[in-house]
Amino acid sequence: MTSLLITGYKSFELGVFKDKDPKVNIIKKAIKRDLKRFLDEGVDWMIFTGNLGFEFWALEVAKELQKDYPLRLATLFPFKTHGQNWSEANQEKLAAFKQVDFVKYSFPAYQSPAQFKQFNQFLIDNTDQAYLFYEPENETNLKYFYNMIIAASDYPLFRLTFDDLNEVMSE
């Protein structure tokens, strides 16, 4: 079993506020290219944390790829209450994260910021590698997770960058 943790920018961090935004198609094209490569290299589990934006788009692509690959999907939410205050449209996306092969949460509810660090460490300790859409120059809260991955020297990290998206766009 080879697992791939998938996470990255949230939609609002990319200036994407509608599902039909043209940027989404470019991002999904890059995701599909990369996920196929991971699958061809033996990845058979893709792990999500239930975030909107990059993770949701990757989930959509992964569900499509399940038709052609022996792929299993999991969502590990940080909290049982994750997404409970989302809009109705986003509740549908949350439901998609729950309609996978394996679903668990780490904590019943948020109590302290330390839970995020514990959750991130759990993800690193229990997955084989990460696929991350993040650039340190465009800093968000992902910086904490990114820095933990970098500190874990034996944990492979594959990044999708804005340069990669420009390449996909020019193809």
Curated annotation (Swiss-Prot):
Range of residues in the leader sequence: none
SUPFAM superfamilies: MCP/YpsA-like (SSF102405)
A Pfam family that the UniProt record links to this protein: YpsA
PANTHER family according to UniProt: UPF0398 PROTEIN SPR0331 (PTHR38440:SF1), UPF0398 PROTEIN YPSA (PTHR38440)
Family: Belongs to the UPF0398 family.
Name under which the protein is recorded: UPF0398 protein stu0232
Protein's organism: Streptococcus thermophilus (strain ATCC BAA-250 / LMG 18311)
Native organism taxonomy: Bacteria, Bacillati, Bacillota, Bacilli, Lactobacillales
